[in-house]
Amino acid sequence: MFNWVKTAMLMAAITALFIVIGGMIGGSRGMTIALVIALGMNFFSYWFSDKMVLRMYNAQEVDETSAPQFYRMVRELSTRAGLPMPRVYLINEDAPNAFATGRNPEHAAVAATTGILRVLSEREMRGVMAHELSHVKHRDILISTISATMAGAISALANFAMFFGSRDENGRSTNPIAGIAVALLAPIAGALIQMAISRAREFEADRGGAQISGDPQALASALDKIHRYASGIPFPTAEQHPATAQMMIMNPLSGGGIANLFSTHPATEERIARLMEMARTGRFE
């Protein structure tokens, strides 16, 4: 129930932000148009955003014939987690990463890059997929997929605001500075809304993944290895669609300094420390 409340709050917050931007661009008429668009986007996000995200990454569905070891691993972990078997996808990218998507456990999918399968051992890969299945089990995937879709729409609308500026109901330009301000601040606001939920969700998925696999040290080792390898390998698709970054097990976007303040993922060092403490104590709390 709590995850449905979080989903509703997220959709309401992003819808409100969408309407504010619409009002800045076109006054009351712009707010009305933005509301209609936002409602349509929320409907679309719920039913189709998983397919859109998988298409963005050109993910290819695999089965036990085309990727036997990986597919069997996901099936075994799904059974341990008490989940239906999700659809399994591979993404032809060198950057090591993985994510889960879908509106509920019955309509879930997990995806991994070919790079992560090359970099990680089988034990480490089990830790990663257990983490993703924890997202599925706790229905985080609906939240992350919707927020990724809506954040992308906010960025597009903010760019529109910068180009056309602020206008009244008659279409007259009123305050060009306001348009620039919206274009700069709206994506930040959208990122903060995502970040408010995403960081805590990653810690919870680490804990849940450790419970599913029974091996928190494997996930800790995987996170350390992904962190070290990913920094030197570009992930162009993720860079083109930055709103989807929070779906990944590790933030795929390059950059540091101020950019890290708005990261949707907690610090890798802290995640590893928590997992190693679980391994030491045997307590998954």
From Swiss-Prot:
Sites binding Zn(2+) sit at: H131, H135, E202
Q: Where is the active site?
A: E132
Q: How does it sit in the membrane?
A: Multi-pass membrane protein
Cofactor (UniProt): Zn(2+)
GO annotations under biological process?
A: proteolysis
Question: One Pfam family from the UniProt entry?
Answer: Peptidase_M48
Q: What is its EC number?
A: 3.4.24.-
Protein name, please? Protease HtpX homolog
